[in-house]
């Protein structure tokens, strides 16, 4: 990535100045590892640079150690990804994509006609199926799958923190949240010896009706075994977004503010009940 090239250039600059015995060799080895994408995380690079810093302090009276520390600070700040990216998609898109995949693989002829509890049951039962991320699907389904595969690639190359949050706009049901978890998992199921895609799923409740139902939706979700596994991955932390603009269009300024206030109270109480941060 361009950020790693910047780190490589910084190291080259250090190598030209730090020609001390034992230091030059360390910097050369670090530069080669960056050039060949050998570092799996920024913490590994920092560990190697700290060895350089320690050696300078112990053997060369700390000469130029400030330059190495400056680079360490830069890497601590920007890691391998510079800034975090969020992914956002409308729940209606996920619904269409899941319906297409299930229909094309003969798992369900018409997912959209299922009742909510039937959708939950089907998604829970098929979430570990392999071979679902590749198929003769619609362009929309292929685009969503490709997006998730791209996120996995970016996470593998730049660290899990580079892209973590997946925001579901217009969340209106338990299924609309599970559909994203299901899509992410079917991508993971078909990975061959690669790091797993990891998403922090963030429901966004926007309309007055959805804000009113938010706590009921989340309570049902918290009690589902497949979502409990996801909560465990995130140390029982759950981010929830409450939208203002759609609520204003739906019920007006005062109604939207009141609905958000009430939703916050109920969701906070629910989180405490289930020991969720």
Per-region residue spans from a language model:
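Extended, charge-enriched "interface" segments that sit outside catalytic cores
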Residues: 1-157
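Structured mid-domain segments that build the active-site/substrate or prosthetic-cofactor binding neighborhood
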Residues: 1-2, 269-277
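Short glycine-rich or small-residue beta-strand-to-loop segments that form or flank ligand, phosphate
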Residues: 35, 53, 166-169, 201-204
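Beta-sheet entry/capping signal
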Residues: 72-73, 80-84, 161-166, 198-202, ...
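Alpha-helical scaffold elements within enzyme catalytic domains, especially in hydrolases
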Residues: 74, 266-270
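Active-site cores of enzymes that catalyze phosphoryl transfer or operate on phosphate-rich substrates
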Residues: 83-85, 90-178, 182, 186-190, ...
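A conserved P-loop NTPase coupling/switch region
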Residues: 191-199
């Amino acid at each position: 990535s361009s950020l790693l090239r910047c780190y490589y250039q910084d190291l080259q600059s250090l190598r030209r100045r730090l020609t001390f015995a034992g230091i030059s060799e360390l910097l050369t080895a670090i530069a080669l590892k960056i050039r060949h994408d050998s570092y799996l995380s920024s913490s590994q690079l920092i560990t190697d640079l700290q060895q350089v810093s320690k050696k300078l302090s112990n053997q060369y009276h700390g000469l130029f150690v400030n330059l190495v520390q400056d680079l360490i600070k830069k890497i601590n700040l920007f890691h391998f990804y510079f800034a975090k990216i969020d992914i956002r998609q409308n729940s209606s898109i996920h619904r269409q994509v899941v319906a297409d995949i299930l229909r094309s693989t003969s798992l369900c002829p018409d997912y959209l006609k299922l009742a909510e509890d039937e959708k939950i049951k089907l998604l829970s039962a098929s979430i570990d199926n392999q071979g679902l991320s590749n198929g003769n699907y619609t362009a929309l389904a292929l685009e969503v799958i490709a997006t998730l595969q791209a996120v996995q690639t970016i996470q593998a190359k730049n660290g899990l923190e580079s892209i973590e949050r997946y925001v579901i706009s217009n969340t209106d049901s338990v299924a609309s949240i599970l559909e994203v978890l299901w899509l992410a998992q079917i991508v993971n199921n078909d990975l061959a010896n690669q790091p797993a895609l990891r998403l922090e799923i963030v429901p966004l409740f926007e309309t007055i009706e959805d804000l009113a139902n938010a706590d009921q939706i989340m309570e049902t979700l918290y009690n589902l075994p497949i979502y409990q596994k996801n909560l465990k991955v995130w140390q029982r932390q759950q981010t929830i977004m409450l939208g203002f603009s759609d609520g204003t269009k739906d019920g007006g300024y005062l109604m939207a503010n009141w609905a958000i206030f009430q939703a916050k109270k109920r969701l906070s109480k629910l989180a405490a009940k289930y020991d969720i941060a």
